[in-house]
Curated annotation (Swiss-Prot):
Subunit structure: Monomer.
Locus of motif 'KMSKS' region: 603-607
Record-listed ATP binding positions: 606
Protein name: Isoleucine--tRNA ligase
Gene Ontology MF terms: aminoacyl-tRNA deacylase activity; ATP binding; isoleucine-tRNA ligase activity; tRNA binding; zinc ion binding
Subcellular location: Cytoplasm
Cofactor(s) needed by this chain: Zn(2+)
Lineage: Bacteria, Pseudomonadati, Pseudomonadota, Gammaproteobacteria, Pasteurellales
Gene: ileS
Biological source species: Pasteurella multocida (strain Pm70)
């Protein structure tokens, strides 16, 4: 009769499910986290610890979140959770950017334009309501990602208190002397009818006219004298410029040349032209000129103030010197329209040349402009070309495809246009140099970020902070009606406005009666009607939020983390404002991540059909798979996502979950209070396993601390798959299942598993937050309610320095065991054995390996998972060495009976009898293990 020995075994048992079923389980966990006020419990547990402040860059409150948003928020959450585990107080206050044009456009579609279909005050209220709805929608999606934060009290740039603080930051910049009003060229969107910030400009390919234009010399003799032309040549003399914006020719007021460049007067067929020496050949080829004769040469500095007739207006323009002129293309003579180019404006100002002011806010030529009155700028391209051809000023016309600035919102070409605006001056009070100095004090991750933002700061123009919009924080200034000078009490008045905005929001500014603040002065001053650039809103959050929120205790932000496009966006605006108000950078570290692309490296696009949404991923795989994908990726470059890539993340997840389940199942019946074994009493292999976890934890903590999350996952997978899965957990099954339930051999093993589980759950919590919370509920022993309030486990220990069977020892054993497994696999293929336990091994080892294996005595077979293993000198070998030199393995099939309980082949009397080891474990005192 066959006896069932199942009840005599310590079989693994746990309520922790094998399948994650994340898409179904995670929402219930979120509900529990919210009901139990998890975020505030983390705050309480962290009170008094050193702080780490990651300041959330506000996403725009418009539309649903995309995969890039998910990457960004998950990276932030991993950092905040890992910093908490590393012993920091790391509050997370999510925020939203709520003012600005995109919301205005949406609301216009719903209620009409302000001051046409609806009052401006009603329009602002509609914008506020719309933004609030968008925030709620995005908030739900961010929470679903498993991101922990103060979601009940986020910062919104439209909160009255925040709006007031934005005005206060503005007032501080004014007080420190960084503000001025000027008419200078800014990016102008014809569709927005407003100026744009640098960060609101995108570059796309556009086909434009490419024209070479003649400006005839006013005094030909003066030109010939400057060029020392002995051969004077024949025909009209003209300076030739090149441009792709014919519509700016009416605004031309000068031609720029470089003082150190060589210029030549050359005969082109029957006319004479002035060109940079290095570009003569190129221009001749472009214009189809075959006969070229050099008539004279001169340095640019000697040609200054020569005058040339405007092609179709009755005035002349001078040659002026400019450092921006190069010979990279064109003619080396630069068409200069001060209204429509940054360099043009700077050089015109320097030379006392006034702007033309021909284009209105609507993008049309003003009514008094000859030839082009009432025409739009882009339609005027053809008209200007026709006019140039009519007057004989066109040397060459063609078309060119080139990169051209477009509005980020409308995707339409924009123009440079001079308008009266308010600016933060880069050279005022040494702002540019101070900002460059502050950049060097910041840690940039990856480090190329430093050079990138330095170059941007070096080259950026003054910051146009005013907008002609309705939904935005006001430029809260009073200016004199006649002189346009600021009121002498401006700083004080800005604070008075801020106090009112704090009570009633930005509408308080437009409702404000000037006399209320200015008294008798009210008749002489007007309120500025403009709003602040939304980049001022978000750029001032170091002031309006970080300095203000009590959770931050007046500390500055340790980290800003956004996509790499924010070097010219939020990182830039924050740096400029903080330097202007506080003379320092607002952050200590700046981390940037790349953009998401598909598996083939292509941008996400509706037309390609390769868009992956976070909502779809979570519905299919669950939030933890999305989080694991983010953590596994080197975020410093492009971040690839596809179904295949997510499936790989799901496979890795299963390995981690299976490891956790094995640990939990084998902790069945273990009470750490009662059963924990002291380190010195544990089996050597168990001590080594804890040491493995100890070493892994040090590396994982270091990787978290340095934001190397892919290194965290790699180390975690190595630990689960190799150190534990294919070695330790494999070996301990026999001891765990077959020894006496309360034996030292089993409790030692469970002690190791318990320590490892306590460590592992904390390692994965910043990334696999839902799964960690689930594991936490199943680990035996008293514990806090949530893993997220805990620091990394401090109960691990390293092997004693005097331990002979140290890590180096076990690494050698693993190498030899891998060789044994190779030989066993061959024996299986050769049908010598089926399962490994059918094998009896004779190992022939040299003087290095023999003593090493001998240390394990009769427990070597348990390490090798065979029924018998004996070691003999290599000289006795009757089989060849394998892949490890000095080591040979002979496999024979055991002739013994298989024990019905432990399945080892040994000294059982018959197939139904227990082996002596199992008999001792079932009926006696229990076997004694020393090593494994």
């Amino acid at each position: 009769m066959t006896v069932d020995y199942k009840n005599t075994l310590n079989l693994p048992e746990t309520g922790f499910p094998m399948r994650g079923d994340l898409a179904k389980r995670e929402p219930n966990m979120l509900k529990s986290w919210y009901e139990k006020d998890l975020y505030q419990k983390i705050r309480q547990a962290s009170k008094g610890k050193k702080s780490f402040i990651l300041h959330d860059g506000p996403p725009y409150a418009n539309g649903t979140i995309h995969i890039g948003h998910a990457v960004n928020k998950i990276l932030k959450d991993i950092i905040v959770k890992s910093k908490t585990a590393l012993g920091y107080d790391s509050p997370y206050i999510p925020g939203w950017d709520c003012h600005g044009l995109p919301i205005e456009l949406k609301v216009e579609g719903l209620v009409g334009k302000p001051n046409q279909n609806i009052s401006a005050a009603q329009f602002r209220e509609a914008c506020r309501q719309y933004a609030a709805e968008q925030v709620e929608g995005q908030k739900k999606d961010f929470i679903r990602l498993g991101v922990l934060g103060d979601w009940d009290n986020p910062y919104l740039t439209m909160n009255y208190h925040t709006e007031a603080n934005i005005i206060r930051a503005f007032g501080k910049a004014v007080e420190n002397g960084h503000l001025y009003k000027g008419s200078k060229p800014v990016h102008w969107c014809l569709d927005c009818a407003s100026s744009l910030a640098e960060a609101e400009v995108e570059y796309e390919d556009k086909v434009s006219p490419s024209i070479y234009v003649r400006f005839s010399a006013v005094d030909s003799d003066a030109v010939l004298a400057k060029f020392n032309a002995t051969d004077k040549g024949t025909g009209n003399i003209s300076a030739v410029i090149w441009t792709t914006t014919p519509w700016t020719i009416p605004s031309n007021r000068a031609i720029a040349i470089h003082e150190n460049l060589d210029y030549q007067l050359v005969q082109f067929n029957d006319e004479r032209v002035i060109l940079a020496k290095d570009l003569v050949e190129e221009v001749a080829k472009a214009a189809g000129v075959e006969q070229v004769v050099i008539l004279g040469e001169s340095k640019g500095k000697d040609l200054e103030w020569l005058r040339f007739q405007h092609p179709f207006y009755d005035f002349s323009v001078p040659f002026i010197l400019g450092d921006h002129v190069t010979t990279d293309g064109g003619t080396g003579l630069v068409h200069t329209a001060p209204d429509h180019g940054h360099d043009d404006y700077i050089i015109a100002q320097k030379n006392g040349i006034e702007m033309a002011g021909l284009i209105g806010n609507d993008g049309l030529f003003k009514a008094d402009v000859p030839f082009f009155a009432g025409k739009g700028v882009f339609e005027s391209n053809d008209l200007v070309v026709a006019k140039l051809q009519e007057v004989g000023a066109m040397l060459k016309f063609s078309k060119i495809k080139h990169s051209y600035p477009h509005c980020w919102r409308h995707k339409t070409p924009i123009i440079f246009r001079a308008t009266p605006q308010w600016f933060i001056g880069m050279e005022k009070q040494g702002l540019r140099q101070q900002a460059l100095s502050e950049i060097k004090k910041v840690r940039w991750i990856p480090d190329w970020g430093q050079a990138r933002i330095e170059k941007m700061v070096e080259n950026r123009p003054d910051w146009c902070i005013s907008r002609q919009r309705t939904w935005g924080v006001p430029v809260a200034l009073f200016i004199h009606k006649e002189t346009e000078e600021l009121h002498p009490r401006t700083v004080e008045l800005v604070e008075e406005v801020a106090k009112r905005v704090e009570q009633k929001g930005i509408q308080a500014w437009w409702d404000l009666d000037t006399a209320e603040l200015l008294g008798a002065d009210a008749d002489n001053y007007i309120k500025v009607p403009d709003t602040l650039d939304v980049w001022f809103d978000s750029g001032s959050t170091y002031y309006s939020v970080v300095k203000d929120r009590p959770e931050f205790n007046g500390q500055e932000a340790d980290m800003y983390l956004e996509g790499s496009d924010q070097h010219r966006g939020w990182f830039m605006s924050s740096l400029m404002l903080s330097t202007a108000t506080d003379n320092k950078a607002p952050y200590k570290q700046v981390l940037t991540h790349g953009f998401t692309v598909d598996g083939q490296g292509r941008k996400m696009s509706k037309s390609i059909g390769n868009i992956v949404t976070p909502q779809e991923v979570m519905d299919k795989f669950g939030g933890d798979i999305l989080r694991l994908w983010v953590a596994s990726t080197d975020y410093t470059g492009e971040i690839s996502v596809s179904d295949e890539i997510l499936k790989r993340a799901a496979d890795a997840y299963r390995r981690i979950r299976n490891t956790a389940r094995f640990l939990l199942a084998n902790l069945n019946g273990f009470d750490p209070k009662r059963d924990l074994v002291k380190p010195e009493e544990m089996m050597v292999l168990d001590r080594w396993a804890v040491d493995c976890a100890y070493q892994a934890q040090n590396e994982i903590k270091d990787a978290y601390d340095n934001y190397q999350f892919h290194a965290v996952i790699q180390r975690l997978m190595k630990f689960c798959s190799i150190e534990m899965g294919s070695f330790y957990l494999d070996i301990i099954k026999d001891r765990q299942y077959t020894t006496k339930a309360d034996s030292l051999a089993r409790r030692s093993c469970q002690t190791a598993l318990w320590h490892i589980a306590e460590a592992l759950v904390r390692w994965i919590a910043p990334v696999l937050s839902f799964t960690a919370d689930e594991i936490w509920q199943y680990i035996p022993g008293e514990r806090g309610e949530f893993v997220f309030t805990e620091e990394f486990y401090n109960g691990l220990f390293a092997l004693d320095a005097n331990e002979q069977m140290n890590d180096a020892y076990w690494q050698q054993v693993i190498t030899l065991r891998n060789e044994v497994n190779r030989v066993l696999e061959q024996a299986r293929n050769d049908k010598i054995i089926g399962a490994a336990l059918e094998a009896e091994l004779t190992i022939y080892a040299n003087d290095t390996y023999a003593p090493l294996l001998a240390k394990l005595q009769n427990e070597l077979r348990f390490v090798l998972l065979t029924s018998k293993a004996e070691v003999k000198p290599l000289a006795d070998a009757d089989v060849a060495e394998g892949e490890v030199k000095g080591f040979a393995v002979k496999v024979v099939r055991s002739a013994n009976h298989k024990c019905p309980r432990c399945w080892h082949y040994s000294d059982s009397k018959d197939a139904e009898s227990l082996c002596s080891r199992c008999d001792e474990n079932v009926n006696g005192q229990g076997e004694v293990r020393q090593f494994a």
